[in-house]
Amino acid sequence: MQKNNHNEEIEKEFEEVIVNIGRVTKVVKGGRRFRFTALVVIGDRKGTVGYGFGKAKEVPDAIKKAVDDAHKNLVKVNIKGTTIAHDIEHKFNASRIVLRPASEGTGVIAGGAARPVLELAGIQDVLSKSIGSNNPNNLVRATIQALTRIKA
C-alpha cells in the first residue's frame, strides 16, 4: 500500500498532455482488428520532462501505458530564466527541430508536437521551427534530445 501512495504523489507533481492517439488495424481472416497507440508528454514545468508511448486494445489502457512509460523516460532540462541558454538544432530520423531563445513575454512559439514538450519543460519564451517530417513521435524525441543538449 505504501508504494501505491508514493506513485500517486509522483503522478500529482507531473502534468500530462496526450500528443497523439493512433488507430492501428490488423487485417485477419474474420475482418479487422483494431488497436490503439498513445503518445504522452509529462512534465513538472520546472525543468523535468519526459515522453512515453503505449499500445493497447483500448484507448484508456494505451494512455495509461504511455504515462507509465513517460515516468521511466524523464530528463532534466537546463533553463535560463524563462528561456533556453542558446540556439540549438537537432535531428531525429527525418524530423529536424530548431530552437532559439526569445525575449521575455514572447511566449512559446512552436507548432505540432514540440509545443507540449517545451511548455511542460517549463520554458516560457522560445522560438522553434520544425523542418522535415512532422511525425509526432519523431518530433517529440527530437525536441527532448535537443533540450538535453543545451548547456547551462
Swiss-Prot record:
Domain S5 DRBM: 14-77
Record's GO cellular component terms: small ribosomal subunit
Keyword rRNA-binding: yes
Keyword Metal-binding belongs to the record: no
Signal peptide interval: none
SUPFAM superfamilies hit by this protein: dsRNA-binding domain-like, Ribosomal protein S5 domain 2-like
GO BP terms in the entry: translation
Entry GO MF terms: rRNA binding; structural constituent of ribosome
Sorted UniProt keywords: Ribonucleoprotein, Ribosomal protein, RNA-binding, rRNA-binding
Highest taxon in the source lineage: Bacteria
NCBIfam families listed in its UniProt record: rpsE_bact
Subunit architecture: Part of the 30S ribosomal subunit. Contacts proteins S4 and S8.
Family under the similarity heading: Belongs to the universal ribosomal protein uS5 family.
Task of the protein: With S4 and S12 plays an important role in translational accuracy. Located at the back of the 30S subunit body where it stabilizes the conformation of the head with respect to the body.
This protein's domain notes: The N-terminal domain interacts with the head of the 30S subunit; the C-terminal domain interacts with the body and contacts protein S4. The interaction surface between S4 and S5 is involved in control of translational fidelity.
Protein name: Small ribosomal subunit protein uS5
Gene: rpsE
